[in-house]
Amino acid sequence: MKPELNDKHEKIVSIPLVKGLIITLWGILALVLFQSAHLFLIRSFGILNLLVATLTIWFIVQRPYLKISGQWLKLEAGIELAAGIVFTFLVYTPVDFIYYISIGIFFIIILQFIYGYALLNTGVYNVPNLVMRFVTLMSGVVVGVTLFSGMVGFSQAFLVVGVFSFVYGIINIRYGLTLKSDVLGTIK
């Protein structure tokens, strides 16, 4: 049964808003602790990914009527779950963190490109949303290449990822605040 859609935020849980808050929180932690608490940052990154994956799965289960958006959300939840498991249980060193985070950034960039292209092909898009996707995509390429090539040390890598997370989180918060309905993509 499909719930009635409305223009008010009181009846919907905006997953991009919650994700944005979590990503921004981790970005702030990374900016504050980038020199001293590498293992804490790695573990907290993994745990927060597990939390976000759980929220996304809950959102999908509550809204089985979502079609294309639901498919993308399932993929997103799978990626978040995998990242949560890897960073919580398998990564112990900054070297491994930098390696896996750069691969993750490249993977997310590819998905952003595919999703943006799919939106363009369907004619369902919002120009500011596409511009933000492009900016995120380009900055993600720069961050991913910088990390993967080893151009920065461990502390600087955490700083770079922290800044990227902070900005990406703010973009998600902005997107989450502008959603009019839980059929992701309907924007004011």
Question: What is the meaning of each model-derived region?
Answer:
Residues 1-58, 177-188:
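N-terminal topogenic module of multi-pass integral membrane proteins
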Residues 3-4, 54-67, 113-121, 172-179:
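C-terminal ends of transmembrane helices
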Residues 7-21, 64-77, 120-137, 155-157, ...:
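Cytoplasm-facing juxtamembrane segments at the starts of transmembrane helices
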Residues 22-29, 48-55, 79-86, 104-115, ...:
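Membrane-embedded alpha-helical transmembrane segments of multi-pass integral membrane proteins
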Residues 37-51, 95-107, 158-163:
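Structural signature of hydrophobic alpha-helical transmembrane segments
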Residues 83-133:
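Membrane-proximal helix-loop-helix units in multi-pass membrane proteins
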Residues 83-93, 137-154:
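Hydrophobic alpha-helical transmembrane segments in multi-pass integral membrane proteins
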Residues 143-188:
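Hydrophobic secondary-structure block in the mid-to-C-terminal portion of proteins
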